[in-house]
C-alpha cells in the first residue's frame, strides 16, 4: 500500500496543478477532486460515470474512495468533463514516469525483463470514441458509404509487456488528432514517430526492444 499511496499522492499533486478554467473563488470541488474522481471511476472498475455515482450513493465502494482518494462526494460526469476536457493530457505525463520509477525501485519490472535485461514496449493504435453525430474539433473522420461520415477519437498506447505476463505497465500515450499546419489527417504511423521523438530517449535506460 505504501507504493500505491505514493502514486496516488503523485496523482493528487498532478491534478492539483491542472489549469482551472473557472472564474471566482466559490469552488465546491478542487481540480484535485475533479481529477481523482475521474481516476476513481477506472480504479473501481465502474462501467460508466452514472454507474459509479449510483454505486457510491448506495454505499458501495464509498469507503474505498474516501480512504484511497479522500473523496466524500463525486462530482457529476458533466462537471468532470467540463473541467477536464480543456486540459492538455501532457499534464499527466509525470505520473506515468513516477509509476515506472516506483516499479524500477521496488523490483516490479523484474518480471518484464527479457534476456539481456531488455523490456518489450508495445505501441498500438486504439479508438475510444466513435459516432456519426457527436464530434468535436479534435475528431478524425472517415467515410462510411456515400453520405455517412464517421467521427472518432484515437490514440497510440504505449505499454511495457512480457510474454505470459497478464499485466502491462502503461506509458505516456500519444493522441491521434488533427495537427497544426498539416492538411492531411493524423495517423498511427505519425503518432509513433512523435512518441519516439518525445519519449524514446527517456526510456532508453529500460533497454527497450
Region spans (language model):
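Gly/serine-rich nucleotide phosphate-binding loop at the start of the catalytic core
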Residues: 1-75
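Structural motif corresponding to the C-terminal cap of alpha-helices
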Residues: 19, 107, 199-203
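Generic alpha-helix structural propensity
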Residues: 32-36, 44-47, 51, 75-82, ...
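Short, conserved catalytic/metal-binding motifs centered on acidic residues
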Residues: 37, 52, 76, 80, ...
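Short, flexible active-site-proximal loops enriched in glycine and acidic residues
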Residues: 49-51, 62-75, 92-96, 110, ...
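Charged/polar, low-hydrophobicity segments characteristic of intrinsically disordered regions
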Residues: 65-82, 188-194
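Active-site-proximal, Lys/Arg-enriched surface segment
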Residues: 81-165
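Electropositive, glycine- and tryptophan-enriched low-complexity nucleic-acid-binding patches
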Residues: 143-206
Amino acid at each position: 500500500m505504501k507504493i500505491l499511496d505514493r502514486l496516488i499522492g503523485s496523482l493528487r499533486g498532478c491534478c492539483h496543478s491542472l489549469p482551472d478554467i473557472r472564474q471566482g473563488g466559490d469552488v465546491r470541488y478542487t481540480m484535485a477532486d475533479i481529477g481523482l474522481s475521474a481516476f476513481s471511476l477506472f480504479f473501481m472498475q465502474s462501467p460508466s460515470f452514472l454507474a459509479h455515482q449510483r454505486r457510491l450513493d448506495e454505499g458501495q465502494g464509498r469507503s474505498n474512495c474516501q480512504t484511497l482518494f479522500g473523496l466524500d462526494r463525486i462530482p457529476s460526469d458533466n462537471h468532470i468533463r467540463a473541467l477536464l476536457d480543456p486540459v492538455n493530457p501532457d499534464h499527466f505525463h509525470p505520473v506515468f514516469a513516477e509509476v515506472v520509477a516506483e516499479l524500477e525501485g521496488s523490483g516490479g519490472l523484474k518480471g518484464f525483463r527479457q534476456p539481456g535485461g531488455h523490456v518489450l514496449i508495445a505501441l498500438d493504435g486504439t479508438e475510444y470514441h466513435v459516432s456519426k453525430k457527436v464530434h468535436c474539433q479534435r475528431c478524425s473522420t472517415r467515410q462510411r458509404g456515400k453520405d455517412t461520415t464517421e467521427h472518432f477519437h484515437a490514440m497510440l498506447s504505449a505499454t511495457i509487456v512480457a510474454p505470459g505476463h497478464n499485466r502491462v505497465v502503461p506509458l505516456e500515450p500519444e493522441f491521434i488528432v488533427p495537427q497544426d499546419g498539416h492538411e492531411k489527417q493524423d495517423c498511427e504511423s505519425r503518432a509513433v514517430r512523435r512518441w519516439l521523438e518525445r519519449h524514446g530517449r527517456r526510456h532508453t535506460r529500460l533497454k527497450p526492444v
